């Protein structure tokens, strides 16, 4: 075929999910092959100029050629351009024009190229049509016999032979009344319209080997290797599937076999390309599987099989959460240990308070003395002895204070009546106060009261003072016991039934 360039194959073009190999050709100009009969009719110089304009640019005619071609009132469609011819005389010779046009009919070879864009891929349709006859219907009114010889039949024929490219390529478009008839229809299916470009269904994809950690259990093949289950079939659209979708298919298969849990992620490796990508990689949703296959076609031989190796590893987020939980649990255990220690200390203090409040067990000896006995949970012998010594000292102090108070009270009562008045029976005696001073008996009882009623009745003051002394002694004793217990709390406990080393 003249003027047809060699076809360039592209293996990644699909139609309805099928992979095909397309032919790529540059656009060709419309060529008109004139036969000898047509050449003999080129006798008019003006017509030759029109023919040269058509051969140079079939889409454009100059205005001068149009003016020179106006010889009849017939209207012809030449590449969507109207040329009106106004004859001098109107004679109806339609049959004569039809006969002359039939004699001048020639064989026309039309080669067209239409590029269609479908789903991001180019589809090439190469059309080769041959017509044996061209039947044109003349439009218009009558022509005159005298002016029929002046009508350039060559121009009329050329005007009907030029066909719009869009009308030939697009099968769905309707040809107008002036279009060429008997044009072979063009199919929408590129397999039917493409003769030179061979189709390929990418059978080499079935040569891909998917290797899993345990291929015997999770292989994608049944008992018969010839009839296996594949991740993708020829009808699947690989252009729309990303690596993330590929991971999803593999995960669904492995989870159905109970071979993969949510704490593990898949790791996909292409050994032929030295590429690895994990399931949680952000680029997995941006790279399409067909991109990897295109790289394989360049770097690998299609006659050899390629492999995809899958493995598993702990997910980053799962392992991270596990470590955080371990650190949190260890911190909680340390807090629990501190709380347990504080609880033990509080229990020790409560026990000490209970021991301080308890009265020691006592036994009366034969001589009437009181002996304090110790239980297993009581204080040590040293502490008990010290406490007993403090108790004896306190009792002796209390006795002395009570004796002094009784003597003072007896002296006071001897000098005063019950109502506080001086005893008149003793006025002859020399009044002596507690301090040894002389008393003026002429002083009234009111003067005595002014000196202080408390000095006359000092028993209340002595009672208060003795109570203060007893309280101070008791407080000091408790402080000594508490300090001894705190000092012994930090040392290992010893059996209280065994004598100490001290």
From Swiss-Prot:
Chain positions found as Phosphoserine: 328, 330-331
Give the coiled coil ranges: none
Biological process (GO), any one: meiotic cell cycle
Entry's Gene Ontology cellular component terms: cytoplasm; nucleus
What Pfam families does this protein's entry cite?
DUF2420 (PF10336)
Organism's domain of life?
Eukaryota
Residue ranges with Acidic residues bias = 367-378
Where primarily located? cytoplasm
Q: Which UniProt keywords apply?
A: Cytoplasm, Meiosis, Nucleus, Phosphoprotein
Report residue spans for region: Disordered: 353-391, 420-440, 454-502
Q: Where in the cell is it found?
A: Cytoplasm; Nucleus
* InterPro entries reported in the protein's UniProt record: UPF0646
Q: Where is the composition biased (Polar residues)?
A: 420-436, 462-477
Q: What does this protein do?
A: Required for normal levels of gene conversion events during meiosis.
* Family membership noted in the UniProt record: Belongs to the RMR1 family.
Protein name (Swiss-Prot/TrEMBL): Reduced meiotic recombination protein C1442.04c
């Amino acid at each position: 075929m003249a003027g047809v360039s060699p076809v360039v194959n592209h293996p990644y073009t699909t139609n309805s999910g099928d992979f095909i190999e397309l032919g790529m050709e540059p656009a060709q100009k419309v060529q008109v092959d004139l036969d000898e009969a047509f050449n003999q009719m080129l006798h008019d110089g003006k017509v030759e100029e029109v023919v040269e304009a058509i051969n140079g640019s079939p889409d454009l005619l100059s205005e001068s050629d149009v003016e020179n071609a106006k010889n009849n009132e017939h209207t012809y469609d030449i590449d969507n351009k109207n040329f009106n011819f106004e004859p001098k005389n109107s004679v109806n010779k339609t049959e004569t024009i039809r006969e002359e046009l039939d004699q001048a009919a020639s064989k026309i070879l039309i080669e067209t190229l239409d590029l269609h864009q479908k789903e991001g891929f180019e589809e090439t349709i190469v059309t080769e049509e041959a017509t044996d006859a061209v039947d044109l219907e003349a439009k218009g009114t009558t022509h005159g016999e005298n002016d029929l010889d002046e009508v350039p039949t060559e121009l009329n024929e050329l005007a009907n032979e030029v066909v719009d490219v869009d009308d030939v390529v697009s099968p769905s478009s309707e040809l107008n009344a002036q279009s060429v008839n008997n044009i072979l229809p063009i199919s929408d299916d590129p397999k039917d319209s493409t003769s030179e470009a061979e189709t390929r269904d990418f059978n080499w994809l079935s040569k891909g080997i998917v290797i899993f950690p345990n291929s015997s259990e999770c292989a994608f093949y049944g008992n018969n290797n010839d009839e296996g289950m594949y991740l993708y079939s020829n009808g699947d659209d690989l252009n729309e599937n990303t690596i993330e979708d590929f991971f999803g298919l593999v995960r669904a298969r492995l989870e159905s076999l109970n071979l993969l849990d949510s704490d593990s992620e898949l790791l996909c490796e292409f050994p032929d390309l030295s590429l690895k990508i994990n399931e949680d990689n952000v680029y997995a949703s941006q790279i399409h599987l067909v991109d990897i296959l295109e790289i394989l076609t360049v770097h690998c031989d299609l006659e050899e099989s390629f492999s995809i190796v899958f493995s598993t590893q702990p997910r980053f987020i799962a392992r991270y959460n596990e470590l955080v939980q371990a650190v949190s649990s260890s911190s909680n255990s340390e807090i629990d240990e501190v709380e347990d220690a504080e609880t033990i200390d509080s229990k020790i203090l409560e026990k000490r308070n209970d021991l301080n409040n308890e009265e020691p067990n006592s036994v009366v000896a034969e001589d009437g003395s009181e002996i304090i006995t110790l239980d297993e949970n009581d204080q040590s012998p040293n502490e008990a002895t010290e406490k007993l010594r403090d108790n004896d000292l306190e009792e002796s102090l209390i006795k002395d204070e009570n004796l002094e108070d009784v003597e003072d009270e007896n002296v006071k009562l001897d000098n005063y009546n019950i109502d506080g008045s001086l005893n008149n029976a003793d006025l002859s005696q020399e009044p002596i106060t507690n301090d040894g001073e002389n008393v003026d008996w002429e002083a009234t009882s009111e003067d005595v009261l002014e000196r202080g009623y408390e000095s006359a009745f000092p028993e209340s003051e002595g009672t208060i003072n003795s109570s203060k002394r007893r309280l101070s002694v008791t407080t000091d004793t408790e402080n000594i016991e508490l300090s001894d217990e705190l000092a012994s709390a930090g040392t290992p406990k010893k059996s209280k039934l065994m004598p100490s080393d001290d």
